[in-house]
């Protein structure tokens, strides 16, 4: 039986890092990103676009088991020059205002929101609704973990 630690809130954590998906992702992510950033740091002419490309590439390489990751990796790899790579799907996000109408066409509103979600998820426009909804949860979790890892890297470097 594997050893476990229980914290005060009765949450059980595995002591084996490979059993914790968040830890596995973070370890993979930093192992891809840190060497790339060190390499960029040696080149003082690195642009924001180049850094963003490396951040997105590390995200895609760290979560290859997901369809959105493979689409993102394909998109990033299709450009040999990171400065010409189109931005990731999270750029250009616009917030849709909900119309305040009673008894409106709710079905049409749901369809519109699903279309917007498909645009946000890498490869989402090529997925059916069930697959897209499954993938979006994983994508959001990986973005949250990416944010935590990037904040940690920034704190450690200052």
Curated annotation (Swiss-Prot):
Q: Where is the composition biased (Low complexity)?
A: 77-90
Q: Where is the composition biased (Basic and acidic residues)?
A: 94-110
GO molecular function terms noted in the UniProt entry: DNA binding; DNA-binding transcription factor activity
Report the GO terms under cellular component: nucleus
Give the GO terms filed under biological process for this record.
regulation of DNA-templated transcription
**Protein name as it appears in the record:** Transcription factor bHLH146
Return the annotated region ranges for Disordered: 77-110
What compartments host this protein? Nucleus
- Write the record's keywords in alphabetical order, separated by commas: DNA-binding, Nucleus, Transcription, Transcription regulation
Alphabetized InterPro entries for the sequence? bHLH_AtIBH1-like, IBH1-like
The UniProt record lists the bHLH domain at: 94-143
Q: Provide the family line.
A: Belongs to the bHLH protein family.
């Amino acid at each position: 039986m594997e050893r476990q630690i229980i914290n005060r809130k009765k949450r059980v954590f595995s002591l084996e890092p490979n059993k914790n998906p968040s830890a596995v992702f973070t370890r993979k992510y930093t192992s891809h990103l840190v060497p790339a950033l060190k390499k960029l740091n040696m080149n003082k002419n690195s642009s924001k676009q180049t850094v963003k490309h490396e951040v997105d590439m590390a995200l895609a390489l760290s979560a290859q088991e997901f369809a959105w990751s493979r689409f993102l990796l394909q998109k990033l790899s299709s450009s040999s020059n990171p400065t010409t790579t189109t931005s990731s799907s999270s750029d250009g996000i616009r917030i849709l205002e909900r119309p305040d109408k009673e008894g409106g066409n709710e079905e049409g509103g749901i369809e519109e929101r699903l279309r917007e979600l498909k645009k946000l998820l890498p490869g989402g426009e090529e997925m059916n609704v069930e697959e897209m909804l499954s993938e979006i949860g994983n994508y959001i979790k990986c973005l949250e973990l990416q944010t935590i890892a990037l904040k940690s890297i920034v704190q450690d470097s200052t």
